[in-house]
Amino acid sequence: MPYIPHTPAEIREMLDAVGAPDVDALFAEIPAALRPQSFDLAKGATEMAVRAAMEKLSAKNRTDLTSFLGGGFYDHYVPAASDLLLSRGEFYTAYTPYQPEASQGTLQAIFEYQTAVCRLMDMECSNAGVYDGGTALYEALMMAVRHTRRKKAVVSETVSPIYRIVLATYTKNLHLDLVVVPHKNGLDDFEALTAAVDGDTAAIVVQNPNFFGSVQDFTALFDHAREKGAVSVISCYPVLQTVLKTPGAMGADIATAEGQSLGLPLSFGGPYLGIMTCKKSLVRQMPGRIAGRTKDAAGRTGYVLTLQAREQHIRRQKATSNICSNQALCALRALINLCLTGNEGLSRQAARSIENANYAAWKLGAIPGVKLLNEAPFGNEFAAVFPVNAKQVARMLMDGGIVPGFPLGRYYQGLENALLICCTEKHDRADIDRLARRLENAL
């Protein structure tokens, strides 16, 4: 396809159509200081010169910080073989064909991914993945709305505020009633949640561990939701599912997760992976694609797209999703990581992360004026309350090369002095001891 630039007349016509006086007006939201002053490109440079220029730009990013940030996105170790396997041309550049059975390797990879996450979550069905944890939770909510034909959802305030923003944005014009039930010191208010779920409720939406890191059992709440005809939706942390009570064991109808922790780099926020699993009774409401295994006429094993509710495959008005092929690569990375790590390795990863977090909580709890937000069990992160503003604490420690955690006051009123502190298996006791010393000195 040749590249033919637009004529001045065509550009003028497009600007008139959107009501812009000139091209610069299209970029008015970008501060002038950040806009390039000229688009005159220099002459070609050598590879060595380009590399030096890129390294100079890259040096502006700090990579020497010891980070205790979490909040849904975690710095776990990724096996070196992951990048090598993912970079194979058959996977890295392949596109999902519109005659999908022509690509048996891609379909088998999707099928194996679905099998792995179903086992991890203790659920019956999975799709090929969606964009991220937030969109997975939204899609789960819409599954519940379609299934129950109700327009009310009860959402715990302990669900990630980032996810709740996604829910509010996507449902803004869908006339859904999102009832957010306030937390109690970083814990789910079971009494209030139970009272909020009634005969008009499509879904109850919770998270485990919740955004504050606390671990709770939702079995009784899900039983109550079932009695009211509502769908139980839970958002999870995949790595910890090997040591916590699973969504399936709690009786969840739909379990979602942010799959970033399964081998995807943090990478400035993406691309990530939305994991979606559900009970078989809800599989027809599942968005995206679902790969299945069958036998051909000759009795040989073959893989097919059993369900494909994406708009590229069926009529738009019938589609439940427009999730595209890029997610298959992210799902493949999660599968590779799960296979390389194994169930035992994932359990060790989870146990070490929890052990480090408990050690950090013990060390910080010994600092005068510092206390935990609550006494509930937690996974690999916890909320600590300081006698001064948490943002101020974070700034002081960053100057010394430590990111101590996420200031909860950004999303929760009344918690301006609280930090969400996360540990993974990549931290050691020396890191945590240094964090405790710096915090004590800062206070």
UniProtKB/Swiss-Prot annotation:
Its EC number is 1.4.4.2. InterPro entries: GcvPA (IPR023010), GDC-P_N (IPR049315), GDC_P (IPR020581), PyrdxlP-dep_Trfase (IPR015424), PyrdxlP-dep_Trfase_major (IPR015421), PyrdxlP-dep_Trfase_small (IPR015422). The keyword Oxidoreductase applies. Keywords: Oxidoreductase. It is an enzyme of class 1 (oxidoreductase). It catalyses: N(6)-[(R)-lipoyl]-L-lysyl-[glycine-cleavage complex H protein] + glycine + H(+) = N(6)-[(R)-S(8)-aminomethyldihydrolipoyl]-L-lysyl-[glycine-cleavage complex H protein] + CO2. CDD domains: GDC-P (cd00613). GO terms for biological process: glycine decarboxylation via glycine cleavage system; nucleoside metabolic process. GO terms for molecular function: glycine dehydrogenase (decarboxylating) activity. Belongs to the GcvP family. N-terminal subunit subfamily. PANTHER family: GLYCINE CLEAVAGE SYSTEM P-PROTEIN, GLYCINE DEHYDROGENASE (DECARBOXYLATING). This is Probable glycine dehydrogenase (decarboxylating) subunit 1. It comes from Solidesulfovibrio magneticus (strain ATCC 700980 / DSM 13731 / RS-1). The lineage of its organism: Bacteria, Pseudomonadati, Thermodesulfobacteriota, Desulfovibrionia, Desulfovibrionales. The gene is gcvPA.
